[in-house]
Amino acid sequence: MKKQKLAVCVLSAALMIGAATLTSYAAEGWQQSGNSWIYVDNNGNKVTNTWKKGADNLWRYLDSQGNIASNCWVDDEYFVESTGIMATDKWLKLPKRNPAWNETSATTVWYYFSTSGKMVSDGWSKIGGKYYYFDGDGAMQTGWVDDDTYYTNADGVMQIGWAYLEDPDDTKKDDDEVKPGDDDEDHHWYYFQSSGKKYVPSLGGAKYKQYKIDGTYYSFDENGAMQTGWVDMGNSSGFANYRYYQSNGQVQTGWLSTTPPEDDDYNLDLGSDVQWYYFSSNGEPKVGPKISDASTSNLVRINNITYLFNEKGNPVYGLRRLEVGTSGQYACYFFGADKATSSVVKGKGNVVEGDGTTGQFYFADSGNKAGRGYSGVEDGFLYYMGKLQKADSGTKYEVIEVNDKNYLVTTSGKVVKSSTVKDANGTKFKTSSAGVVTEVDGTSDDGSDEARTPVEPTYWED
């Protein structure tokens, strides 16, 4: 804005008005008196304490002596400049005044005088297409105004959009020393809507609320301060309440590796180690049940990879037992050996079980049971819940029941097919092409009396 600075306020009793500017009249009107101009009425008397226009159509004020005033306030609402002309449509920087005490201070502030010459005061005014805020004495305001609902910058212009500011209830004034991104608890980002009004959420009992700005979610507290890091939104119970906001305030979506919230408000034993989290498009974290209560219904597919999340929002890893839906039946899944994997593993491989031993496993490669520990014969070997089933050392062969069928297997887990063999005790078994027992010691028998239950995997515990 175009502003003109004036340093002092005085009264001039001898300001000349050039003949080219003012016209002298014989009767009522302007007359030259020595080096000054006065205004006389029809009776030839000086006019005092009033406004009069000159031939240039500009207003001047005649003081108590009838002289043209300059550099002073008139009626606490108008100002005449050093030329003696009323200030109109302009900014002036003047000593701050206190009309109630008829005092001025050494501090200078900006005032704006309208087309009528009257000082703008007490609220908002649109000047040159921009909004400014003035106090009751007409001084232009900067900083927080109007009950801390709006903010005006150093030039007095109403703030629109984002601004990193000292909190309105703080008294120290060190804005120049703090920059966006600095760790200063007395400063926050605020968002001012197109009306200039600071966004303040209606919380309805919650501590924070999420608000969408230009397609991105942000979180604000009861004072409108933007939040970063972990924020408990208080929308439900458990870890699903949390959102994570980046240093720029934008809600985290997708994968994030970070430490858990410091405030464990839900007694989840979150710890302090870095963990993986996954957030939906609105910032809600993926959360599952306790692992002991997990089922296949809790499996989550993200970018064609299957995960299981626990009640802390972390993807699970290790060898786990899951209920199949609500059937009461259970299946084995392997989610990798560490946090770096934390997703369903398919195919064959060695797996460290919960007791520290390493076993051979097979997890279905495809189909709606992909990743589930396989039960049955695969590539000539017998598996139960994914774990390879072997005859005990020294037995040579054993009958193991899987899926209501009695298979004869070796100590390496290989299924004996279409053969007649004897175990270490001399018991003779005959098997079908599928490896199922058909005779025991020459008698038709499915081997039920000799069969044992399969060895179930030893699952990981947290």
Language-model segments: what does each one mean?
Residues 2-462:
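Extracellular adhesion/carbohydrate-binding repeat motifs centered on closely spaced tryptophans
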